Amino acid sequence: MVKESDILVVGGGHAGIEASLIAAKMGARVHLITMLIDTIGLASCNPAIGGLGKGHLTKEVDVLGGAMGIITDHSGLQYRVLNASKGPAVRGTRAQIDMDTYRILARNLVLNTPNLSVSQEMTESLILENDEVVGVTTNINNTYRAKKVIITTGTFLKGVVHIGEHQNQNGRFGENASNSLALNLRELGFKVDRLKTGTCPRVAGNSIDFEGLEEHFGDTNPPYFSYKTKDFNPTQLSCFITYTNPITHQIIRDNFHRAPLFSGQIEGIGPRYCPSIEDKINRFSEKERHQLFLEPQTIHKSEYYINGLSTSLPLDVQEKVIHSIKGLENALITRYGYAIEYDFIQPTELTHTLETKKIKGLYLAGQINGTTGYEEAAAQGLMAGINAVLALKNQAPFILKRNEAYIGVLIDDLITKGTNEPYRMFTSRAEYRLLLREDNTLFRLGEHAYRLGLMEEDFYKELKKDKQEIQDNLKRLKEYILTPSKEVLKRLDELDENPINDKVDGVSLLARDSFNAEKMRSFFSFLAPLNERVLEQIKIECKYNIYIEKQHENIAKMDSMLKVSIPKGFVFKGIPGLSLEAVEKLEKFRPKSLFEASEISGITPANLDVLHLYIHLRKNS
């Protein structure tokens, strides 16, 4: 049977959900093919959304019309701001989720969205015509034709699950791997490598002894992800903290020879920042304990996820390890930990739109691109979906710059640098992180969302008004000069503020930590009518004014540099600081400007700085 649509999405994980929903929202006829409809939106690993860098991605996805944020707000069990004591640039919202509720909400949203149909089957191969994808075939002899195809297969491509010496061909425990599609992609000439990730055991909630464990509460004023969320007052559950101990470590050491990670059974590289417990014991042998979080998987507290205990050790060893830990002495394991090895395609095979360079109309998103994490997958799925629709409409692609969004950093890192280990987002990856805060996501991306038809006009008008008020009042504060007069000192004293000794502007005064919203309104009457969202932005911009201005200067410098032309016949060979790889690519593609050079996979900002310097030197000589 042959069926037709505008866009096909293969895979119903977090990337596939966002890709299919956003494409349908933008008016395309979308068909989602997934192995199991019941697992659409399943959180395969930890029951949480957000975190450092990841919270930024979730909020960016939300502003650009995605679903992850709003689903999390309706399924959360505990909400916290991580790094709350640090500056706003590195804070991250994180929520424990009810995995069942999240999955059901995601699945129902997909099944009830106009322009979007779903079928339960396995994609086996791509249909190509003149190096352009025109559809797929499935395991039940269905043929689907479409103008664009987005592949979001997660860990299913040639997936192998490892528990001790045992191996099974699964894309997730108990689910079939996608071997035919994996073979098809290899035959098409894509650069395919292997990665590994893992998950932690789960234990029955009623078998845990919580007495004496440290209780971990959510925030009193819980943060939320979606700007559409109203009247947020969730019921929050506690998590609990326990630790491994020397006995735990000895059990693991005694069984290193049975660990797939060390026996040579696993070849794929695992996530650097989420190592298995056996890897931690091996690498950090001097540590006497490692912290573990017991996280409820649902509101019913029937199962707890042991965060920090990712493992692929044999079943009997997992039992001994868990029973050696305080509070888990009599714990009943409901699901064992395991490692999974899978194919991914080097993301240097992609353009900034996530379309493959090799096959026109084919987009890749999520773990197939070498990333790890629900949020990274959702961000890629969203961008692939948006760009597939824009390509259908013959409109300009939507590409976010590194100074606009963490999504821009994520995609640029992937396609220019590639990866040899599972890539996850951190605030440290963003050189302009002071400009890319969670708190200003709406102001950064609202205009893009509105232009793409992904934000309501009334809300956008409010947002535009707020943005103007921020700019106007920051200008006014910079021009508002205060002297240590008797009147000014009296007013500061009334607010319990330290006096000023010299002339200062309003921005400098508001840079004080102690100058809260109430004091801002009291001291500067023109700020009194402003809403909390506007005041928050003014406060942050004042506090980090010097650093923010410096980052804007760096952006202007970079933009100016990218406009520099590369002289015809310019010799790249022999320039100190350029790697052999960079020279080979520059000689091959012969870019006409530094901007064109920046679009070449593997050419880094450091390469561009070196090129800029030598173009200048050779012009002068």
UniProtKB/Swiss-Prot annotation:
- Alphabetized UniProt keyword annotations: Cytoplasm, FAD, Flavoprotein, NAD, tRNA processing
Q: What happens upon changing S302N?
A: In strain: 60190
Name any cofactors this protein relies on: FAD
* Annotated binding of NAD(+), by residue: 270-284
Q: What is the effect of changing E457Q?
A: In strain: 60190
What GO biological process term is on the record, naming one? tRNA methylation
Q: List the disulfide bonds.
A: none
* Molecular-function GO terms, alphabetical: flavin adenine dinucleotide binding
- Record-listed FAD binding positions: G11, G12, G13, H14, A15, G16
Which chain regions cross the lipid bilayer?
none
Q: Name one Pfam family in it.
A: GIDA
Its localization reads: Cytoplasm
- Which PANTHER family does this entry report, sorted A to Z? GLUCOSE INHIBITED DIVISION PROTEIN A (PTHR11806), PROTEIN MTO1 HOMOLOG, MITOCHONDRIAL (PTHR11806:SF0)
Q: How does it assemble?
A: Homodimer. Heterotetramer of two MnmE and two MnmG subunits.
What protein family is recorded? Belongs to the MnmG family.
Q: What does this protein do?
A: NAD-binding protein involved in the addition of a carboxymethylaminomethyl (cmnm) group at the wobble position (U34) of certain tRNAs, forming tRNA-cmnm(5)s(2)U34.
Q: What is this protein called?
A: tRNA uridine 5-carboxymethylaminomethyl modification enzyme MnmG
Organism name: Helicobacter pylori (strain ATCC 700392 / 26695) (Campylobacter pylori)
